[in-house]
Amino acid sequence: MGAGLPFAVGVKAATPEAQVICLHGDGSFGQNAMELDTAVRHKLPLLCIISVNGGWTADPERNMPGRDLGYTRYDKMAEALGCYAEYVEEPEGIRPALQRAWKKVEEGMVGFVNVKTDYRARATTVRFSSRKT
């Protein structure tokens, strides 16, 4: 968990001509978020998209202890590191934000889109939130 951005940076470094897009959840992104700095310093333009649902896994009833992460503004951190960054709160803002970010990637920047998502949303094929450890 949390290996998406390091892998994306590695792919871009190994194949500079590749179009690299990394999609992360907020919890896993937090584990290796500073790899954005690596991408910026080494001029590895890629697009990183974060689904910020405020916690580990989906919890429709909000009753799982230790799940809450809050809605971290990773876009502000990304911008401070030199990325082009946007924060999106409404579904209709996603496509335009991705288009603007991808344009910046094509210009040689690291693009970053932090998308606030519903904490109740989850995949229906795999229910990680119902797994017990």
Locate each region found by the language model.
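Thiamine diphosphate
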Residues: M1-T133
